[in-house]
């Protein structure tokens, strides 16, 4: 499984839903959704500043990430979703050992 960082902002309707049901209920709903897709929630935080919610998820593959983005983004409760693949230091160690035949443009 791969780790992903998700950040998003709630729309006005999304904020109303969080205020009505509570933060714990939102976390539980996300954990249930991710579990049903074969993943786990490592971290779930509400944030102040650039993002309203920040999650670290373990997910099976990029197809699952796309499905989550389509479903959650299409529901109208969140906006400005950003997804990043997270790499461990050991994964970077392995990447550094991988030979890459790259030539810059014009060389």
Which residues fall in each region the model found?
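A compositional/biophysical signature of low hydrophobicity enriched in polar/charged and small residues
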Residues: 1-107
């Amino acid at each position: 499984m791969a780790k992903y960082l998700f950040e998003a902002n709630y729309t006005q309707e999304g904020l109303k839903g969080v205020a009505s049901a509570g933060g714990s209920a939102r976390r539980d709903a996300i954990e249930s959704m991710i579990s049903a897709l074969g993943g786990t929630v490592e971290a779930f935080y509400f944030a102040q500043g650039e993002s309203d919610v920040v999650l670290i998820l373990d997910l099976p593959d990029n197809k699952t990430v796309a499905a989550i983005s389509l479903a959650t983004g299409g529901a109208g409760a969140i906006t400005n979703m950003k997804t990043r693949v997270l790499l461990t230091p050991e994964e970077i160690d392995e990447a550094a050992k991988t030979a890459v035949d790259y030539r810059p443009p014009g060389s």
